[in-house]
Amino acid sequence: MASFLRFRLSASLKPYITFGRMLYTRIDKDGLTMLAGHLAYVSLLSLVPLVTVIFALFAAFPMFADISIKLKAFIFTNFMPATGDIIQNYLEQFVANSNRMTVVGTCGLIVTALLLIYSVDSVLNIIWRSKVHRSLVFSFAVYWMVLTLGPILVGASMVISSYLLSLQWLANARVDSMIDETLRLFPLLISWVSFWLLYSVVPTVRVPAQDALIGALVAALFFELGKKGFTMYITLFPSYQLIYGVLAVIPILFLWVYWSWCIVLLGAEITVTLGEYRAQRHQAITEKSPSQSQEI
């Protein structure tokens, strides 16, 4: 009986073990940590230009003033844990200084911001082993759309949430508590949708929607857990402040950006491996069927 249970258990776990091995092999072959380090470096170079371009676009349209404020609070609270206030102060100073830049300097900012999106595009297509290249005009259009429409859609969704909370018929204890619990999941939902779009749109090959959704969900869950774990580490083990002093925000920001890219690329690797695992199983079944028919 015990041997039968062990056999059933090993048989039920075999697909997960096989998938785990395939995933580990792929991560090791692609050099996930090196790719994440590359993106972290480019992100730090592009962070100020990216934030400057985004909020300059909001400033150009007065109707987006409320969205800009809500989006700032959302980004620094949910995407830069524990050090959001300090980094926000520095970035706001940089953005204020950029207003005095010339046209050439402004174009340089935009190019640097687009460089990050180009790097993400290149790395994801390396993971997908894609050899298809988009035209320069199409790529620029996609990058510009991501740069402009992405923050606006996130900010608009937050404004809609605030509007729903202000409605009179929702001023009810039970409904209010339900909405409060739902809004707690809002950052997770935003991360999930963002990662799903990233894995679906950026690669130049067709990505099954189901695989992209699963990979994006895993990445979003790890991202939310990573935020809590990172905040806990900074709060409980503040020894980095004794070493770096006032410069402590620099290594903290770099570590968080690096960890975030590791999570994003892990979700991409899971998405790709799901498709490869399915293809491998289909091939095994196809090869097994003719041999069975010959025996008959």
UniProtKB/Swiss-Prot annotation:
The keyword Transmembrane applies. The chain crosses the membrane at residues 44-64, 67-87, 108-128, 136-156, 185-205, 212-232, 246-266. The keyword Aminoacyl-tRNA synthetase does not apply. It is found in: Cell inner membrane. Its main location: membrane. It is a multi-pass membrane protein. Pfam families: Virul_fac_BrkB (PF03631). One of its GO terms (cellular component) is plasma membrane. Keywords: Cell inner membrane, Cell membrane, Membrane, Transmembrane, Transmembrane helix. InterPro entries: UPF0761_bac, Virul_fac_BrkB. Belongs to the UPF0761 family. This is UPF0761 membrane protein YE0031. The lineage of its organism: Bacteria, Pseudomonadati, Pseudomonadota, Gammaproteobacteria, Enterobacterales.
